[in-house]
Regions:
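Gram-negative/organellar outer-membrane beta-barrel architecture
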Residues: 1-147, 151, 157
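Transmembrane beta-barrel strand/turn architecture of Gram-negative outer membrane proteins
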Residues: 82-88, 157-167, 173-196
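Short helix/loop capping segments that flank catalytic or ligand/cofactor-binding pockets
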Residues: 150-152, 170-171
Length: 196
């Protein structure tokens, strides 16, 4: 897949995605993405074995690199960052409509600051040249999906409850909880109401 767009802050944005659902005939999924713009550049690669165990537990690996360079963006202060990350994740089907996932990701970020960098960044780093900000993130999620069609649903519910914790072993410590609920109802044959 190939996509392109125009953004007031990022200029011309180009994205390329390669998705192989049956990589080399193994039944495993490989997904590679490249998204480039004037400010943000992201490279990511993921590999998933959907039948890691006989009872349907999946296992996946992810690696990524994310670069941010705001020197050409006059609307915000100048800073550069380079992030590298890698993680492992597992998925467990609980029923036909329920799914549980958990994973561990390490993120390693270097931030370069300048005299006109945002104050929040200068305060966080404690100096005007920059710093490193590393984290080890443990994440888990429960998903319930009763939609009649994943691409063009007419009725059903999609729920997602997720939690993420940065373990107290590196620079960052935080926790995040998130709940999303989307409800679909067919009003007529050609019109579906969605409440999010």
């Amino acid at each position: 897949q190939f996509g392109a767009g125009l953004s007031s802050s990022d200029g011309v944005v180009v994205g390329v995605t390669i998705n192989q659902p049956n990589f080399l005939g193994t039944g495993n999924r490989v997904n590679a993405q490249v998204n480039t713009g004037k400010t943000n550049t992201v490279y990511s690669l993921s590999y998933t074995d959907p039948y890691f165990t006989p009872d349907g537990v999946s296992r996946g690996f992810d690696v990524y690199r994310r670069d941010v360079d705001t020197s050409s963006n006059n609307s915000i202060g100048t800073y550069n960052s380079k992030s590298y990350g890698a993680g492992v994740r597992f998925g467990l089907p609980l029923s036909e409509k329920d799914f549980f996932s958990a994973g561990l990701t390490g993120d390693f970020t270097k931030v370069d600051l300048f005299s006109d960098s945002p104050k929040q960044y200068l305060d966080y780093c404690g100096n005007s040249s920059g710093c490193t900000s590393n984290s080890l993130q443990l994440a888990a999620a429960w998903i319930h999906d009763s939609r009649d069609n994943t691409l063009f649903p007419n009725k059903g519910v999609l729920q997602r409850l997720s939690a993420e914790v940065a373990l107290p072993v590196l620079d960052l410590e935080y926790y995040k909880l998130e709940y999303k609920h989307t409800w679909f109802k067919d009003v007529t044959k050609t019109f579906t109401f969605m409440l999010n």
